[in-house]
Amino acid sequence: MKTEHEEQRELVRWFRQTYPGTLIFAIPNGGARSPATASRLKAEGVVKGVPDLFIPAWELWIEMKRVKGGLVSLEQDAMHAYLRSVGYQVMVAKGFEDAKQQIEALRNEVE
């Protein structure tokens, strides 16, 4: 079973090959940190619940989860609701294949 990191890395690689002129980038909010590092990052503006990836040109945030067992936290759910309320799209994907299918479906709607 692939980790969320592996699934996300695969998605970013596929996306950059498929849509080379469209920027996608990661928001490294997650992960274990020391209390001092967490405090410093919070002071710099890191906020709990921000999705893993952003595609500015499409106004699309992507929350990656593992295929099995990946759950959206309360903070993530609240952030997703906020982002949608201000006009962004938010996608929750269970692994690379799910994310790829959702992105392709979204692009088919636009075209």
Map each language-model feature to its residues.
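Catalytic phosphate/metal-binding cores of nucleic-acid and nucleotide-processing enzymes, i.e., regions
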Residues: 1-111
